[in-house]
């Protein structure tokens, strides 16, 4: 039975490519089927990039995918951490496959595929630090910040912040591949971006830079301090970015949350100041913006998995439109 399901999934993927696009000018990456998940189907593509270092791309198809419907698309940062606790650095995972499939089956969430965007390992912070805000840091502060980040990851030197190229990889390479290769709705209202910690910053940045692409940004445990300690300069440049780019006339919906334990204990006061910016920008709470606090929640995948259903329903719930 499992071999039949694998064959069926691969057939559906291949049939989703429009005939007019099946020519030698379009690169179709090698795709493997992984057996590490509990529900649905997980594919791993080797998609080369001109913007960032080459890495795997994970595409999870829910059990509903075989039913012939077009699906929404959720892009998620830190793809290494989403599906398999046996392969993660801390033995935890988001349990994305179990949670999304359950919500779809219970009619709480519209049919959705999940695209796992892998990070660059010890260069993750340089890929996931929003570039426009970073450019507004003073040179002395930025040098100290990124030197400390490089030292923490045992890098011999710092690297240029590369988040703009990471977003180009997502928007110009990954999304076109997903749109032409899978049965998806490709409009912005059917497209969301999600991440935690630095991935939360990048989700905010993605919708700010590409509001025509992403209709919803889901930002969990957003790492507003940017580095390893409290400071005023980094939250200030992020607040300025929100003021100028995260406005109701530009973006669809945006979700923030935070816990109160471990690293998340730093976030509450900063998030409240960001909420004031959103209020000043005329966002309407519980409509096009929401911020939630989770008492006792820590900065880890188990905590994010425990509340994952809430941002998913906010983005793609049956009554979310």
What feature does the model see in each segment?
Residues 1-4:
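Positively charged n-region of N-terminal signal peptides that target proteins for export
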Residues 20-321:
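Non-catalytic cap/lid and distal C-terminal segments of serine-dependent acyl enzymes
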Residues 8-9:
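Residue-level signal for mature regions of secreted extracellular proteins and peptides
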């Amino acid at each position: 039975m499992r071999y039949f399901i694998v064959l069926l999934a691969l057939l559906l993927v291949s049939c989703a490519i429009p005939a007019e696009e099946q020519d030698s000018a379009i690169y179709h990456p090698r795709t493997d089927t992984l057996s590490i998940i509990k529900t649905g189907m997980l594919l791993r593509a080797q998609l080369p990039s001109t913007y960032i270092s080459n890495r795997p791309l994970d595409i999870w198809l829910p059990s509903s995918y075989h039913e012939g419907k077009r699906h929404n698309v959720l892009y998620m940062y830190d793809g290494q951490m989403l599906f398999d606790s046996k392969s993660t650095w801390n033995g935890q995972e988001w349990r994305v496959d179990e949670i999304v499939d359950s919500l779809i089956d219970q009619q709480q969430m519209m049919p959705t595929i999940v695209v796992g965007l892998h990070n660059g390992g010890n260069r993750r912070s340089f890929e996931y630090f929003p570039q426009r805000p970073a450019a507004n840091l003073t040179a002395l502060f930025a040098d100290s910040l990124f030197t400390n980040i490089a030292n923490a990851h045992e890098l011999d030197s710092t690297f240029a912040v590369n988040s703009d190229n990471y977003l180009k990889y997502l928007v110009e390479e990954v999304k076109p591949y997903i749109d032409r290769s899978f049965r998806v709705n490709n409009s912005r209202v059917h497209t969301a971006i999600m991440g935690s910690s630095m991935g939360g910053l990048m989700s905010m940045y993605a919708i700010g830079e590409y509001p025509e692409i992403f209709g919803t940004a889901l930002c969990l445990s957003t790492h507003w301090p940017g580095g390893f300690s409290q400071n005023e300069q980094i939250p200030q440049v992020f607040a300025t970015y929100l003021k100028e780019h995260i406005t109701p006339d530009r973006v669809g919906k945006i979700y923030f949350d935070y816990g109160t334990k471990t690293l998340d204990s730093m976030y509450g006061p900063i998030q409240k100041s960001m909420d004031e910016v959103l209020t000043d920008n005329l966002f309407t709470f519980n409509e096009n913006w929401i911020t939630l606090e989770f008492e006792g929640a820590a900065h880890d995948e188990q905590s994010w998995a425990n509340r994952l259903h809430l941002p998913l329903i906010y983005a793609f719930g049956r009554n979310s439109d």
